[in-house]
Amino acid sequence: MEKFRAVLDLHVKHHSALGYGLVTLLTAGGERIFSAVAFQCPCSAAWNLPYGLVFLLVPALALFLLGYVLSARTWRLLTGCCSSARASCGSALRGSLVCTQISAAAALAPLTWVAVALLGGAFYECAATGSAAFAQRLCLGRNRSCAAELPLVPCNQAKASDVQDLLKDLKAQSQVLGWILIAVVIIILLIFTSVTRCLSPVSFLQLKFWKIYLEQEQQILKSKATEHATELAKENIKCFFEGSHPKEYNTPSMKEWQQISSLYTFNPKGQYYSMLHKYVNRKEKTHSIRSTEGDTVIPVLGFVDSSGINSTPEL
């Protein structure tokens, strides 16, 4: 588990270099292995359709949910949201914008799974041959036994040669759908990235500086938090065995932790690179930084919430 966590931390730390290419390659490779080892079409009129759809869609759903679980923004949004101390979790619009961004990022792996599965064709062939609607369309103008033998096509057990030849048509349909899905995803991703960059309130070089600042801030925060926690633990253990009272340590309160753990919002009136930066520059100690007039969620700045003392959630 520790090795697995180290790999995840490495991916989070160097996500700009690794990008989503690693996720795509791992998903594609996993689908190919899964298809070759676990998938065996039953070649039954009753089971082909549900069996093919389950193998095509259920792993995609699992990957989508896993994308939510591994997103630091998900837990920033949800942690403490239902407690009485945080009855209000921000405006519905702001929350929906963040959820949309999280969903878009989480959709990469499942879309890759579906696209690679369609290019392979096995899942689609199995599901299509078990559909009565597909059977009517595919068997149009063929002999009467076509519909009955169609479920046997994925296993190469159809007696009529013209029926068995439908396997080539099904594979072609599946691969065309796969390439269409890939093209649509790339076009949407390109448009979304271009629009978010176009609407960015900060320049290209400032974004680079921003990411450098966040990396340094989180490294120093983790180092300081580890040092403070170690000293506090040593003091408490020492006092426990000696029966003495511990000396006072200035540890941030629950409210202060909640302030810097909230989702980042951009405000043109103040140039803050993180919620911690915003908190230490507040005008009054009792002033809340969670919601201020003019605060907005900027898609291109979503990376701010992806950083943390340990961005990989506890598994």
UniProtKB/Swiss-Prot annotation:
One of its GO terms (cellular component) is plasma membrane. GO terms for molecular function: monoatomic cation channel activity; voltage-gated channel activity. Keywords: Cell membrane, Disulfide bond, Ion channel, Ion transport, Membrane, Transmembrane, Transmembrane helix, Transport. It catalyses: ATP(in) = ATP(out). Disulfide bonds join C41-C126, C43-C155, C139-C146. Its main location: membrane. Pfam families: Ca_hom_mod. The keyword Electron transport does not apply. Belongs to the CALHM family. Pore-forming subunit of an ATP-permeable channel. In response to pathogen-derived and proinflammatory stimuli, relocates from intracellular compartments to NK-dendritic cell and NK-macrophage immune synapses where it mediates ATP efflux and NK cell activation involved in antimicrobial and antitumor responses. May assemble to form gap junction channel-like structures with gating and ion conductance likely regulated by membrane lipids and voltage rather than by extracellular calcium levels. This is Calcium homeostasis modulator protein 6. The gene is CALHM6.
